[in-house]
Curated annotation (Swiss-Prot):
UniProt keyword annotation of Isomerase present: yes
Organism: Escherichia coli O157:H7
InterPro entries in the cross-refs: Asp/Glu/hydantoin_racemase, Asp/Glu_race, Asp/Glu_racemase_AS_1, Asp/Glu_racemase_AS_2, Glu_race
Name this polypeptide is given: Glutamate racemase
Pfam families for this protein: Asp_Glu_race (PF01177)
Keywords: Cell shape, Cell wall biogenesis/degradation, Isomerase, Peptidoglycan synthesis
Positions of substrate binding: D28, S29, Y60, G61, N93, T94, T205, H206
Function: Provides the (R)-glutamate required for cell wall biosynthesis.
Gene Ontology molecular functions: glutamate racemase activity
Keyword Hydrolase (UniProt): no
Database matches in SUPFAM superfamilies: Aspartate/glutamate racemase
Residue positions of the active site: C92 (proton donor/acceptor), C204 (proton donor/acceptor)
E.C. code: 5.1.1.3
UniProt pathway annotation: Cell wall biogenesis; peptidoglycan biosynthesis
Length: 285
């Protein structure tokens, strides 16, 4: 069946119906959350997946906390009204650090967040120097510093905040080449260190999409650590033990907040990830 772009007022034409499966929402401001979704799908292939990305307010890294909380709650509410959810994953470090309490208070299904994988990185490092590569918002937030104090207080933590890397990851998914020179410029503070980090935390869900390019630029032997696999395991446990019985037989679907030409260009990418349709989601507020 041909895949169609859908407007928010147009009924979605589902693919051939299947057995009802638990409905899981994966949400991000952009397409970086696809890296987390891919880990979850690898572990749990037989779920009904919804991917929602906020291409109206992207990127979140420079937005205020109050704006992010209100926006994320509104989007998850809009999805829940269309498809009752068994579980939601906020696959955005910036949104997770500020919006999880509000989401968990409002909804009765489990909500999983993404936090920088500082704890495993502190265990893996051999030279005691850990790099945290994230958005500027994540680097600045007190939550991140609390994680470091709790799990990596014996390590030297070198933090780099970059909005440009988010844009590079988005461009890669649109089919553009990633400039290694741009990555070298972003990573210059580490590359100039006499002893750079031997373990780097990818503290934004966009950054695993750049793993291949990062390994070409960082010193040989550098370990890259992200939280995708841990999120997948947590999702599996919650679905088994705490999630409500919210299922759908529909095909996987992706939602954007505005049907722009750039969003339409993502359709082939979303298809490769298993999403049958891309539809504009009507969000109040």
């Amino acid at each position: 069946m041909a895949t169609k772009l859908q407007d928010g007022n147009t009924p979605c034409l589902a693919a051939t119906p299947s057995e009802p499966r638990p409905t899981v929402l994966v949400f991000d401001s952009g397409v970086g959350g696809l890296s987390v979704y891919d880990e979850i799908r690898h572990l749990l292939p037989d779920l009904h997946y919804i991917y929602a990305f906020d291409n109206v307010a992207f990127p979140y890294g420079e937005k205020s906390e109050a704006f992010i909380v209100e926006r994320v709650v509104a989007i998850v509410t809009a999805v829940q009204e269309r498809y009752p959810l068994a579980l939601a994953v906020v696959a955005c470090n910036t949104a997770s650090t500020v919006s999880l309490p509000a989401l968990r208070e409002k909804f009765d299904f489990p909500v999983v967040g993404v936090v920088p994988a500082i704890k495993p990185a502190a265990r893996l490092t051999a030279n005691g120097i850990v790099g945290l590569l994230a958005t500027r918002g994540t680097v600045k937030r007190s939550y991140t510093h609390e994680l470091i104090a709790r799990f990596a207080n014996e390590c030297q933590i070198e933090m780099l905040g970059s909005a440009e890397m988010v844009e590079l990851a988005e461009a890669k998914l649109h089919g553009e080449d990633v400039s290694l020179d741009a990555l070298k410029r972003i990573l210059r503070p580490w590359l100039r260190m006499k002893e750079p980090p031997d373990t780097v935390v990818l503290g934004c869900t966009h950054f695993p999409l750049l793993q291949e390019e990062l390994l070409q630029v960082l010193p040989e032997g550098t370990r890259l650590v992200d939280s995708g696999a841990a999120i997948a395991r947590r999702t599996a446990w919650l679905l088994e033990h705490e999630a409500p019985d919210a299922k759908s037989a529909d095909a996987n679907i992706a939602f954007c907040m505005a049907m722009t030409p750039e969003a339409e260009q993502l359709l082939p990418v979303l298809q490769r990830y298993g999403f049958e349709t891309l539809e504009k989601l009507a969000v109040l507020g």
